[in-house]
UniProtKB/Swiss-Prot annotation:
Biased composition (Polar residues): 164-176, 288-312, 451-461
WW domain ranges (all copies): 56-89
Gene name as annotated: Cep164
Bias (Acidic residues) ranges: 218-228
GO biological process: cell division; cilium assembly; DNA repair
Protein name, per record: Centrosomal protein of 164 kDa
Sites of Phosphoserine modification: S202, S1369, S1371
SUPFAM superfamilies documented for this protein: WW domain (SSF51045)
Chain residue ranges for the region called Disordered: 106-132, 159-185, 217-238, 250-408, 424-570, 830-849, 1261-1287
Amino acid sequence: MARRPILLGDQLVLEEDSDETYVPSEQEILDFARVIGIDPIKEPELMWLAREGIEAPLPKGWKPCQNITGDLYYFNFDTGQSIWDHPCDEHYRKLVIQERERWSAPGAIKKKDKKKKKEKKNKKDKETSKSPLVLGSPLALVQAPLWGLAPLRGLGDAPPSALRGSQSVSLGSSADSGHLGEPTLPPQGLKAAACAKGLLASVHEGKNALSLLTLGEETNEEDEEESDNQSVRSSSELLKNLHLDLGALGGNFEYEESPRTSQPDKKDVSLDSDADRPPTPGKLFSQGADSSVASANGSKSQGRGASPWNPQKENENSDPKASSSQMAPELDPGGDQPSRASKKQQAEDPVQAGKEGECRRESAAKEPKEASALENTSDVSEESEIHGHLKDARHSGSEASGPKSFLGLDLGFRSRISEHLLDGDTLSPVLGGGHWEAQGLDQEEQDDSKSSIAEPQSKHTQGSEREHLQSSLHSQATEEGPLQTLEGQPEWKEAEGPGKDSVASPAPLSLLQREQVLSPPASPERAEEKHSQAEELGLEQPEAEETEEKVAVCPSSPVSPEVQTAEPAAPQKLFSEAILKGMELEEDQRLLLEFQKEKPQQLEERLWEEEEEEVCQLYQQKEKSLSLLKAQLQKATAEEKEKEEETKIREEESRRLVCLRAQVQSRTEAFENQIRTEQQAALQRLREEAETLQKAERASLEQKSRRALEQLREQLEAEERSAQAALRAEKEAEKEAALLQLREQLEGERKEAVAGLEKKHSAELEQLCSSLEAKHQEVISSLQKKIEGAQQKEEAQLQESLGWAEQRAHQKVHQVTEYEQELSSLLRDKRQEVEREHERKMDKMKEEHWQEMADARERYEAEERKQRADLLGHLTGELERLRRAHERELESMRQEQDQQLEDLRRRHRDHERKLQDLEVELSSRTKDVKARLAQLNVQEENIRKEKQLLLDAQRQAALEREEATATHQHLEEAKKEHTHLLETKQQLRRTIDDLRVRRVELESQVDLLQAQSQRLQKHLSSLEAEVQRKQDVLKEMAAEMNASPHPEPGLHIEDLRKSLDTNKNQEVSSSLSLSKEEIDLSMESVRQFLSAEGVAVRNAKEFLVRQTRSMRRRQTALKAAQQHWRHELASAQEVDEDLPGTEVLGNMRKNLNEETRHLDEMKSAMRKGHDLLKKKEEKLIQLESSLQEEVSDEDTLKGSSIKKVTFDLSDMDDLSSESLESSPVLHITPTPTSADPNKIHYLSSSLQRISSELNGVLNVLGSLNSQPPPQGLGSQPPPPLFTSSLRSSKNVLDPAYSSQAKLSSLSSITPMSTQWAWDPGQGTKLTSSSSSQTVDDFLLEKWRKYFPSGIPLLSGSPPPPENKLGYVSVSEQLHFLQRSHPRVPRTDGVSIQSLIDSNRKWLEHFRNDPKVQLFSSAPKATTTSNLSNLLQLGLDENNRLNVFHY
């Protein structure tokens, strides 16, 4: 079943492969019948549905698929629906229900009523007929006139008979679809003439077309909208070029259908042995090889919107060679072939038709199916048109209009057997069913006329018979009024068709008369049929008379073997009576023709107007729905375009920002240059103004000095005159001395006045220059501030616009997703509604179809093979003529195209000529531009020369300014002297102010020192009380140590006594030193905790920075993937066909949404991590500040005395118990720190809580970062996270520990914490440090001396916890520390010797352990003599331990 499988994800998509040789077994048919609800035993009449459904192919869009478990299911790639059962099963279940209901409905009552109504009208026919004919009775040999073919003409000139002929052909194509499972019909006499072969061919085609009628309609429903425009163009344009005018082929081609379709037939087992089941696919192909002729005829009515789509149209367009090959064996241009040749052809036709059917089926499976132009309109308007056409049909009195209109509909179903003809749209109105019947009748009449009757006589009898029959039928029609249609013939909407369908093509009256003679007297329906035939003949008689060519119709063999044996015994009397009656009917026929010429034209116009209005309405509705869908799609595409435009806008904004920055920078540079030029100009103006001011002031000073000198001279001269006059009498010596003194005094005063004036003038000039410079600096600073503010504002606005654009883009993305969901739901609802409407119409059409086919299912099977050869002969002739016409049209089109090509070339030459003119004009313009550029260069050179002249003038002005400055140097010297005096005065004032401020500060310091001394006194009293308490503890411990077995102390306390203090004071001093050491150790541990937490915070910051970078990379990758997905989605929407890549696009979209969700979670987690880090830093700062306050308070209490302790050191192997027993002297309960323990505990707990929350956040970040990104999105794995260590001060402050145990625990804690903080899982590497830095460093140095191979760790401590992210939370570290720090028992419970032995064993084990190499870089003891020296410990002024060598 499957070939060329396609793998989509984990699903395997298979392809359906039809096997022509496959024949289902009876067991398979029975099983499938039970599946669709048929009981094979009780309902054998419904088994044909099971045989048909088991071979039904998959509808379009459905494909079989196989999942990973091997189960098969069916998936619709158009709607996305998936089911387990075959898609056709449910459809055939509904058909079974409809057939069952139709069988249960009563159907015989209507037939009886119709027979009663028609008994009175057909009494004359009963009298004329001598004996009723039964099945197998002999047939009369009568002649029929020959009719010719009308010339070819366009679609606009087609008479009503052309459309009528096309509809009559469709009866054969749909006549025998329901021939199985129908109730038994009453017996009926055979007609006078043989049934047409063409009708039989169309009957078998109807079987093939209707065997899968519902399946074809259901599967191709969605293809109809896509192929509307193509079918409209192909059918309408080609039909205008080529079609057959069947009105001239004989109007009697249809009238014989009416009695055969209106009278119910009895099922004949001898004629149809397969009546209980439908033919197998082989039979369908063999019987329906020529069905393309019938199905192609529906295109004319489709062009008018009268029927649904034609299932044969696409295939006729696709393969003209196959159609010509199918028609070749059926053509028989020879008109006088014997009946044996037709019998021989009957045997050959099934084989040849079977082969042709296989070819057609293969080509139909490969070629795409195209729907006709008016499928959508005909489905909607079908119900509204049925009743209107049927009313017109009743007025015309045509009982046979039901099946003929049914043919025009062509049922709207698409057959699975695709027939191919040469451009089938051009052959749409080929031969009608009535034409086939006429050919068969004419053939028999020609055989009879060879012996007795001449051809002109037959024409004469034909005319008289036609007139007589029409007059009688017209009188019957006026009496009867509107007639009812027979049961089994559904009231189709297309029953009468457009006006052309309500009338039939003209038929020869001789055939009507023969039909009247040969009809049995017991049939009550013959009168109605003849009446309808007469109307059809009368309406189309003018069309037949216009034809000038007479073409001989090929004779055909009799209907069946029974008919052949019965022909020689037929009486000749019947024919003579028919001739007499025909002569009587000629006058009546003329009146009937005149009456009926006007009636069909009015009816036709009215019907066409109604149909056009309905078609326009439906077309408008369709256009509206399509426009709505297009608008929605355009909105979606517009939103996607807006997204792309937003991205483009962002890029443009970034470019614009860069351009703005460059512009701002260039503007600032230009502005600075401008400011510089303005400053230079302003300075130049100031200098010039200062020079003018100096000149003016100098002139004024000189004038003032001259005036003062003149005044002084005048005063002196007056005084001298008065003095001379007064002292003239006195001594001349005194006068001269006094004059000398006065002159000297006046000269000094004059000099002082001149100096004072000059100093005052210089000060004023200096103030003026400084004020101008200050104003200039203020102007420059204000301008710079404005420039910076403008730049900041522009950058802020650009940032705001970028943020707004990003926010709008996110909103648009959300809106697009919601819109896509709404659009998909809307389309799904619309598709379901259309499917329901279509199923409802299909069910109604099927019911009517089955009723119509019940009467005509077993009539034309035997006659089909005989008529096929004759019809194919005529068809080949027509095809040749069509080909010639087509070639002529192609030649004319080719000439027109050559002419158009020549015109295009001529226009192209004109364009080239114009372009050359434009090039010449362009070259002239370029020359003008070059000339203008040369002029501009000359002008630029002139401007450059003028600039040079200006520069020379500026240089000259600068030289003049320098000369002016040289003249003012002596004035500046005088200014300097004046300023020096002023500065000395200001310095004295500043010194006085500084002394006052210093005095205030000293007073405040005195107050602070007094308060501090009070606080220190209080603290000293508390320390004395603590010392007293610890002395008591020391006494108790000394008593216990005296009771121990090894009394030799290793610690010489006598060496500490430098004064004559008592033992009590010595113990107090030692306890004080130990308590301070413990306090230092606790403080140092807290400091180490703070440093470790600081390292952890830095590591956390680095980790967050790395996570931010990785998140940005993932965001960029996500944006690129989204753009790629949008591009793929747009390209997939542009393609009309359904692609399998839509599922991949859907998966990609899900992955993109999941990636955006992960990135949002990472953003929130990183934001929370930043907040926690800030809180942790604040807590650490608070803890550090509290510790600093504590240390500052303790430093004030430290003394300057140095306390020393000596140790008698020996080799490590010779450590005696006596030296170790002195250690309990150092085992003193430490004093708690002076810091507030509640505050420290609160800060520690808050730090622990923050660290635990930070641990959770970082774990979330690591898990998010470790998730694999979707297609195309890559992110690096999270880097190893930071680690943190927590060393609580309470571990150091625990009382009752021995000094050795404390030292060992401290030494084990310190490397463990450093190991966690820096290098997890690889051991600790501590660098050596100076022993004078901290207490911890000193202790580490001592432990290196005692343990050269490294500091011993706790033997039972587990390894540090490992984390896949590298991060260790504070709670886990505390838990690990609690587990790794075993409580060392007190010395009063365990002996010192056992402790020494255990330590030795541990040291040996630690040395031999190759895995632990902790302090490989620690210095080892070089010689044992250094250890034997005396060492002394002492405290310096900073309260630090130092080692003194002796």
